[in-house]
Amino acid sequence: MDYKETLLMPKTDFPMRGGLPNKEPQIQEKWDAEDQYHKALEKNKGNETFILHDGPPYANGNLHMGHALNKILKDFIVRYKTMQGFYAPYVPGWDTHGLPIEQALTKKGVDRKKMSTAEFREKCKEFALEQIELQKKDFRRLGVRGDFNDPYITLKPEYEAAQIRIFGEMADKGLIYKGKKPVYWSPSSESSLAEAEIEYHDKRSASIYVAFNVKDDKGVVDADAKFIIWTTTPWTIPSNVAITVHPELKYGQYNVNGEKYIIAEALSDAVAEALDWDKASIKLEKEYTGKELEYVVAQHPFLDRESLVINGDHVTTDAGTGCVHTAPGHGEDDYIVGQKYELPVISPIDDKGVFTEEGGQFEGMFYDKANKAVTDLLTEKGALLKLDFITHSYPHDWRTKKPVIFRATPQWFASISKVRQDILDAIENTNFKVNWGKTRIYNMVRDRGEWVISRQRVWGVPLPVFYAENGEIIMTKETVNHVADLFAEHGSNIWFEREAKDLLPEGFTHPGSPNGTFTKETDIMDVWFDSGSSHRGVLETRPELSFPADMYLEGSDQYRGWFNSSITTSVATRGVSPYKFLLSHGFVMDGEGKKMSKSLGNVIVPDQVVKQKGADIARLWVSSTDYLADVRISDEILKQTSDVYRKIRNTLRFMLGNINDFNPDTDSIPESELLEVDRYLLNRLREFTASTINNYENFDYLNIYQEVQNFINVELSNFYLDYGKDILYIEQRDSHIRRSMQTVLYQILVDMTKLLAPILVHTAEEVWSHTPHVKEESVHLADMPKVVEVDQALLDKWRTFMNLRDDVNRALETARNEKVIGKSLEAKVTIASNDKFNASEFLTSFDALHQLFIVSQVKVVDKLDDQATAYEHGDIVIEHADGEKCERCWNYSEDLGAVDELTHLCPRCQQVVKSLV
């Protein structure tokens, strides 16, 4: 007989190496074959629901790490809630309309001019659906579970119909109206442009300083004072209606050779230099805050028009005078601030960039040519203080490479002002993980202007608006609902396939159309209105979901995006927020915190991580991040994540190997009869479980990541599993001491696998499939471990022991360095009380100390002589163990004997081997 044959060594088919890139797809195929998503729902049918509503990613392009971070975080939550017994359906969605898809088709060589609008839209739809299939495959490869066979898609007829109904209800409440707003306009293309169609090039522009006389001082400034503005677009001066100052900036009234000028104090030196003022002749006469200057009235330099002094937070001290020329018809900030003061929107420029009749003496001039005419007139009026030329970065049309302008054109708006307070109240009633999230969306809603919902494109949901012969707008409940019904049946392409009269209810008449002819709106809706309608198109429409959702979770850019548009349309139509709880995550940066870009060569994409390391590594990385802020990823970070994964995997494998001959139904030891050390570990498991459950509840995955490592390293690897080898391998198979440990080991393995399951979805499933006697076919169909009250007194006692054990380990390390011993089993440890700790009394209640310390002999005495080393928990002496080494267990003994041909066996091993002979 060989010694090895008498040992109970670990046995498991669970491989040491993960091989995740190859193994994970096999596990996923099994899940799909078993329809695990619906099985999990069926298991919890009738239970309390939890709805995490998916914000739809855009259906264009490959997934980036931000997509992975987002979907994996959502998967953590939904899987955890499912394992807690909630009915938690997860319906992924896609946003499919908008300019990028139009651009993508153009890049692919699709010539829009050679086909009808309806045909072009059909190609857009085909492209979007192709992109969805690609992204869907990649999301599933990350281990994300959801109803991917029936996702929601914003181009589906039923979704578009729901969106139209929201529009109609808002229109019914007077929240939809038509007005003018400045947009990027390309005179060379004669069309409006989206930001994505803008590129920046250097341009030489006039730089002018202009004086505006005070007309009504409001008792604040001197009546003969002048405001100085600076602009690089002289052609917009005819559209000036205001001067904007920052409410919190300090402004000064400066006397310069008898002239009184008002500018920001922080810019006074720069202005003096630009205008060649003699510094000796400059005198600061008065000081104001921008707030105090509000509502002072200035006079337009050459038109019979007032220019109101107003407040705006967009004013900076980076350049200029701190007094900003404001023309709401030609600037985004100007328009937004102008809305607050109900300023007129003047934009006397036509589609070709030429001044209209409204431009007065500049009529017929191309805007760029008008620059000289305007500066000449300002000089004539004595208002031009300085003309110069600068070269600066300026927006150009990406197609024609020609400069663009801001030009006010008719647009459709959703009124924010009428529902702003209701939205703010809804935000107050919404829960947030962090207060700054609430502050962020609250301030955005509080400060935002009206919502421009129209776009001059073709790939989107048409605005369901008609016009009578006399130009009157037709947007009634009857007409809008009829369009919604048509879209539900045929899709929105019908708008581009039929005449206006065929889109109106049968027999529809209107006093503005005596001849019965109508036209239809050509603009489409902003894509944020599309995705912002998902609470109606998805939550209220799908039977397994419900409104409002329990949770929305997206990137922090969605405070101004989807979070904002969703709560706006929901409050406007339903009076409540569409989400009860809001959570956001940061962006994914490289290892140094820099933005990823191809030019820097620092881009890491999900596909690369999955193919090289596996989805579970990507998921473990997500759990390791403080996702509320921006997170970092690099090859080095992923290597560290892989190292942590390896440690987790090997620990689970060790436990699997050592419960291979254990049946919990027949071999378990009742808790009251467990060895105390096993009861300690059982209570530590309960403590770890309670903490992990609490962290899942609070979405604190970084805590889980850290505590899993701590539990594995400190409690298991450094102590329990190391201590356990002498029992699991050496003791008799059915001995009480071995079964006691296996009882707890099995519990740790099962509970840890469950607790890790939402994060390491594939590995947990693999462990489960190798765990004997588990009841559920999949760990993902099991329930989370229950939180059980711990025996605090026992934990406190053993924590003290573990501190004492640390002292013993330190003493062993010293003895090893001094060549007193080699391995710890060569040691004999003597422990005595000292002034700091009564070790001899404390240790009386502990059995098998030599096993707990992993040494051969332990002696506890009241006192030791001066040769002992004093530690926090007693005086300790390390000597070489007495006797000789047992050839089977490697413990030292003075009573070695033989059984059959096996010699050098300690008494314990003699007894075990005899039972095998």
Curated annotation (Swiss-Prot):
Catalytic activity: tRNA(Ile) + L-isoleucine + ATP = L-isoleucyl-tRNA(Ile) + AMP + diphosphate
Motif ('HIGH' region): 57-67
Secretion signal span: none
CDD domains for this protein: Anticodon_Ia_Ile_BEm, IleRS_core
Main location: cytoplasm
Keywords noted in UniProt: Aminoacyl-tRNA synthetase, ATP-binding, Cytoplasm, Ligase, Metal-binding, Nucleotide-binding, Protein biosynthesis, Zinc
EC number: 6.1.1.5
Recorded superkingdom: Bacteria
Gene3D superfamilies documented for this protein: 1.10.730.20, HUPs, Ile-tRNA synthetase CP2 domain-like
Binding site for ATP: 598
Residues at which Zn(2+) binds: 886, 889, 906, 909
Residues annotated for L-isoleucyl-5'-AMP binding in this entry: 56, 67, 554-555, 557-558, 585
One cellular component (GO) term of this entry: cytosol
Classification via PROSITE patterns: AA_TRNA_LIGASE_I (PS00178)
Motif ('KMSKS' region): 595-599
GO biological process: isoleucyl-tRNA aminoacylation
Cofactor(s), by name: Zn(2+)
One GO MF term attached to the UniProt entry: ATP binding
Residues that coordinate or bind tRNA(Ile): 632, 640
Domain notes: IleRS has two distinct active sites: one for aminoacylation and one for editing. The misactivated valine is translocated from the active site to the editing site, which sterically excludes the correctly activated isoleucine. The single editing site contains two valyl binding pockets, one specific for each substrate (Val-AMP or Val-tRNA(Ile)).
Purpose of the protein: Catalyzes the attachment of isoleucine to tRNA(Ile). As IleRS can inadvertently accommodate and process structurally similar amino acids such as valine, to avoid such errors it has two additional distinct tRNA(Ile)-dependent editing activities. One activity is designated as 'pretransfer' editing and involves the hydrolysis of activated Val-AMP. The other activity is designated 'posttransfer' editing and involves deacylation of mischarged Val-tRNA(Ile).
Family named by the database record: Belongs to the class-I aminoacyl-tRNA synthetase family. IleS type 1 subfamily.
Full protein name: Isoleucine--tRNA ligase
Source organism of the structure: Staphylococcus aureus
